[in-house]
Amino acid sequence: NWITFSKKISENNFEVHLLDQRNHGKSFHSNEFNYELMVKDLHEYMSKFNINSVSIIGHSMGGKTAMLFSLIYPDLVEKLIVVDILPVSYNKSYDLIFDSLLSINLKQIKSRNEFNLHLKKYFDDHGFILFLSKNLKRSLDGGFEYKSNIKILRKTYSNVTSSINFHKEYRKEVLFIKGENSDYIDSENLKITSKLFPKYKLTEIKNAGHWIHHENPDDFFSICLNYL
């Protein structure tokens, strides 16, 4: 869905860089995993490709990375869109997701359909199962392996659910996008958020939970494009 979204954005005269963060997708694997390092990765990427300023869209973990990057390097950020996350700590457990993925012996999996059938033991949402199956890729021996560094992500996911702390506020405007059916953004934590992002705006997308770009891609695209 991010690929589809990025293609549509690029058709509106934007140069788009679609980045996988460390231990995710096609990016490198590392035993170290926290927001400070992911901000460093993004800054190094911009330096490597001589990018002087950006508009950033970040969802969930990517949203927290985007917020910390903007706090540390405000002069490099033109527009900031944070999708269904706040700079606060969350008491959410991802154990079921990690358990489901790590319980599969990928050497015995012969097809994606077989992988999806295994995940049905854990999840009822077919769309979410398909989302998790995007972690699969073919290994050199013709079998399957995970793109993401699942074992390290499980070991360090408390770093992802932790809050973003910084000694200065971000003085530019920022747009927070909330999914109507998601509980990641609430009024109490918005008060905390306003201390770091006093000029924030909030919009809500109907018929969507946490995975807004997947559940209501049309409204999500329209809101992002209009803001950019």
Regions found by a protein language model. Give the residues of each.
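Active-site loop/oxyanion-hole signature of alpha/beta-hydrolase fold enzymes
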Residues: I3-E11, E15-I57, S222-L225
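Gly/Ala-rich beta-loop-alpha elbow adjacent to hydrolase catalytic centers
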Residues: G58-G62, A66
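Alpha/beta-hydrolase active-site loop signature
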Residues: Q21-G25, P87, G209-I212
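Conserved serine/cysteine hydrolase catalytic core
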Residues: L140-L196, K201-E204
